[in-house]
Amino acid sequence: MPPAAVRRAPYRDFLQPALQRRFASTTGFLLALAYVEAVTLSRWNHLFWPWFPIGLPGIRTLAIFGSILPIIILRIAHSHMGLRTSNSPIDTIRRTAFSLATLETVITFAVSAWLFSQTYLFSIPADSNLGWITYYSGDRARLNERALFYTVNLIILGIVQGVIHISLDYDRMLLGRVKPRREGDANDRPPTGWEKFTEAAPAVVVRAGMLSMVVALVNYVVLYHFLRRWAWSWALSFFRIFYNLPKSNIPPSQAPWSLLMLGRSIWAGFLLCLLWYVADMAFRLQLGKEPLKNNQPLSAESKDPNGSLLNGLKSKKTRVSAFAMWELALIARDFDARRQAIFEDIDRKDGPMWSQLYVTCLSVLKAVEERVDNYGKPPTPPPAPAETAPQQPPPRLVQPPKDDNVWAPTAPPKGLRGAVGKVVNNVITSPGKTPAEVYLPEAKKRALEATDRILTQEQKDMLRPENVNTMVHTLAFKVLSTPTIGPVFQQLFGRRLTTAVFGQPYGEPSIYVNAAYAVSKLAVSSLAEDRYGNVQRDVPALIRTFTTIIKKLERFRDTLPIHWTDLRKTRECAEVEELLDALKDGLGELVTAFSPYSTDLRLTRADMRLAREAAEKPQRAAEAPAEQPRVPAVENGAAAAADGNAEPEMRQLR
């Protein structure tokens, strides 16, 4: 009896638990931060109870954590792979502004802010007079506008943060890129998540304080004046259900504004923004961790590690395939035993493990080549359905019915009477020229005469089509040069090149970078580890494919025209340059390793010469003048987006 086949567990069976563990650790960290904020809101009239978790601080901690819980759910539901690709920010706004995801995000942040505002109001001591209901004289209840002011301020802060969250695409999962280890940095280890967090913590605190201060000042000076009557009416309608409040919806004549209220609102907003930003950073650091468990690849726990990894690489879901490609690149660089197992796995159903990895990685890289080749071409129409032969009707036993038009008028009578009737009909139905044909030429003539009498020669010259076009272009350039509005409409070269190379609506550069490194590193390692010689058959095609893709990418980058709205006029694109660097590094290692065997591999001198030329990297502009103006960090987001650990404020609006 043959042994039972080993079940190949899908790669997602190992990836999903790892992501869930990271979500859980992030949630625990946020719970600890909620406890710290709960302690800061305690009234320190005792040495023990203000911080003891079993008591009011614990209840307050759960309430604060409940305000951040909708954001955690939102991040889990809306997280996606790849950067948003579009030619300009206005294209992104048009695509996402009125989508359901945008509406959910803004509402979720507003709800989170409202929950935190109520927790903050109930945590403040009673002598601060921040309760919703107050009693001025006797037992008559009155609505306290102080509480209304704090609530409105934090809800506005939530709406603003929701817009920022969508604009800077905080839902994107940032994955790492595996790069070759150079001589001298073999012992260097990447920074841990905690080291990254402590390094970025000061910037997070500053961002939280700045956003809270700006929103509080704008609300204090401008917004609350317009929202006051509506918010007062809504609050009265709600609290009349529980209290005997006045029937008048007119707010008090004097609003209770003071510098103390402004300071309290800034502090409350700072605590809330700190929760949001720390949650965002924790999610990015946790979800951007390498696909390892106990310093081993995730698929190592499978009974068939290579099969599970191959399942992930062939997955249709971008998240699964991206993590699997990242793991393959790590295996190619750091795990000798797994790399050896790949070369020795030759008895698979669909071919040796190396052959399937080779085809998968090259199909990923050739997708870039295909997009470049098809750029600017009309989409291929779907194939027409095959024409079927018409069925022959059965023979008729009787004559078919006539197909003449039964509603057609009868033929006019012939003779003198018919001729006279035809002439009369033509006279009646063709009375002459229409009013437009009669009066329109005369109106044009009168308008030209009036123009000659009223306008001067200079004014006539200004109204010529070429001068009007010049005025329109001048106005357009003035709008594009505006620092606040102009960048929204500019089609920068980097954005257009990224969109063309990585596709729409999302493109994940790490998949292509890791694929280029993994397949080239495995091929180079096969010289010492491939006992069966399966890899050498594919090396010539691999070198030629890398050479072709590099040449096409560089030609496309150098020939893509700069759009007239691009005022920078620079051919810079960090994402595409990073992909080119990965391809050049891989091709350079292939040429160096297999150059002595080029004749045996049937690689001609022309092939090797073209490969060496393609693998050469241009000299970077290290001697650039120091006084060159620095591009603001918010706009220069391409380089930051290419870095998996870039701060969100360093990203551009995509």
What are these regions (language model features)?
Residues 163-178, 226-234, 278-297:
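Juxtamembrane/interface segments at transmembrane-helix termini
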Residues 244-245, 349-510, 515, 527-632, ...:
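Acidic, serine/threonine- and proline-enriched intrinsically disordered linkers and terminal tails
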